[in-house]
Amino acid sequence: MGKEKSHINVVVIGHVDSGKSTTTGHLIYKCGGIDKRTIEKFEKEAAELGKGSFKYAWVLDKLKAERERGITIDIALWKFETPKYQVTVIDAPGHRDFIKNMITGTSQADCAILIIAGGVGEFEAGISKDGQTREHALLAFTLGVRQLIVAVNKMDSVKWDESRFQEIVKETSNFIKKVGYNPKTVPFVPISGWNGDNMIEATTNAPWYKGWEKETKAGVVKGKTLLEAIDAIEQPSRPTDKPLRLPLQDVYKIGGIGTVPVGRVETGVIKPGMVVTFAPAGVTTEVKSVEMHHEQLEQGVPGDNVGFNVKNVSVKEIRRGNVCGDAKNDPPKGCASFNATVIVLNHPGQISAGYSPVLDCHTAHIACRFDELLEKNDRRSGKKLEDHPKFLKSGDAALVKFVPSKPMCVEAFSEYPPLGRFAVRDMRQTVAVGVIKSVDKTEKAAKVTKAAQKAAKK
């Protein structure tokens, strides 16, 4: 095996019928983590049900069905490899909680793959005014996913017609430009997810197709297939050099060991012997040990899901939604209020000051009040349209002051991205998304454990 390949996360977006499942299924199937036995089992079932030609989507449907029934599928199934990367597919949308997942996301996507159906009439439906495609693309951009690949699918259904492909590239370029992407940095790849054309091997059906190209800081990059486009994603920098931020997913009490908080390192590193602070709880203590998958670690780095043992802290003092950080290096704090840019996605009425829905930010799930609507902005340029609007409706973007109903720890998106984006949930759906601009932090009278005092003297 040699050196481990770098990990990247991609999110696959597009209209319901664009062929996302088939395309993703195909990649996972051909380059991926599904073992042969499982594939053979699925193929046999598919054939028995007369769904043989459907096998890629069928593979994905099986995985989805198992996931929806609450059987957690080995996440390896959602992985595939390119020459350079190990790629994890973050939740394919269509899933009801997709937007929430993408924001509170267990992982931030490094790149979005937008699948567009090339079929006659289909393309137009996917990109129409109310299209999901627009919402997903806007969301990806708003949440800081800056790299995009466009795959024009179902090219077989238009007989690999060059003029159709060019027309779609032109329309889609305009569309993504409005969202905020620069089309020159985006590869446009014609594919057939169904037949597997131009996914992994270059297609022979389109003599006119010379390949895709995109501009990067390092110059122009070229390729032919979708796999090559994924392999050409620019390596994201992982924020190990920032101060530690680790939102807690759970806190366990383990006999003979004590209190063990669990969560994903978002920025910085966590090591045994470190003195950490939990916010907004205001508890400071020493980390005794750090482990992942039942193995002791010398340090946990961004992306690692770790459990760590802390001294002199009871399970009652810290909880899910708290954030752990280095007590000596920009420790996390609670907040009295924060200002955020909010985009209203779908709210049936009007939102005015006083509205108090639940915000999902990292692992915290807390009701927050829209305290003041400060200004209404143009969604694309961010330019101010009016001061102190009376209300907001679907499609509006605004700067809003929020006041949490309970102590909460959040950060500015510019400093700690994973702790600076949130979903606004109401009526069992995501009504808005937000990006935090500034935070009014509070100092809480802190509890410093004996272990922390001892460690500080060392």
UniProtKB/Swiss-Prot annotation:
Q: Which residues carry this modification: Phosphoserine?
A: 18, 163, 289, 414
A Gene Ontology term for the protein's cellular component:
cytoplasm
Chain residue ranges for the region called G3 = 91-94
Q: Which GO terms describe its molecular function?
A: actin filament binding; GDP binding; GTP binding; GTPase activity; melatonin binding; protein kinase binding; ribosome binding; translation elongation factor activity
Task: Relate the outcome reported for changing residue 122 to K.
Answer: Reduces interaction with YEF3
A matching Pfam family: GTP_EFTU
Q: Which InterPro entries match?
A: EFTu-like_2, G_TR_CS, GTP-eEF1A_C, P-loop_NTPase, T_Tr_GTP-bd_dom, TRAFAC_GTPase_members, Transl_B-barrel_sf, Transl_elong_EF1A/Init_IF2_C
Result of mutating residue 156 to W? Increases KM for GTP to 4.2 mM. Preferres XTP over GTP as substrate
Where N6,N6-dimethyllysine occurs, residue numbers? 3, 316
**Where along this sequence does the record place binding of GTP?**
21-22, 153-154, 156, 192-194
Residue(s) carrying Lysine methyl ester:
458
- Record's keyword terms, sorted: Actin-binding, Cytoplasm, Cytoskeleton, Elongation factor, GTP-binding, Isopeptide bond, Methylation, Nucleotide-binding, Phosphoprotein, Protein biosynthesis, Ubl conjugation
HAMAP family attached here? EF_Tu_A
Q: How does it assemble?
A: The eukaryotic elongation factor 1 complex (eEF1) is probably a heterohexamer. Two trimeric complexes, each composed of eEF1A (TEF1 or TEF2), eEF1Balpha (EFB1) and eEF1Bgamma (CAM1 or TEF4), are probably dimerized via the eF1Bgamma subunits. Interacts with eEF1Balpha; the interaction is direct. Interacts with GCN2 (via C-terminus); this interaction is direct, occurs in amino acid-repleted cells, may be stabilized in a ribosome-dependent manner, reduces GCN2-mediated eIF-2-alpha phosphorylation and is lost in amino acid-starved cells and by uncharged tRNAs. Interacts with CEX1.
Further facts: Present with 827 molecules/cell in log phase SD medium.
Name this protein carries in UniProt:
Elongation factor 1-alpha
Q: Which organism is it from?
A: Saccharomyces cerevisiae (strain ATCC 204508 / S288c) (Baker's yeast)
- Gene assigned in the entry: TEF1
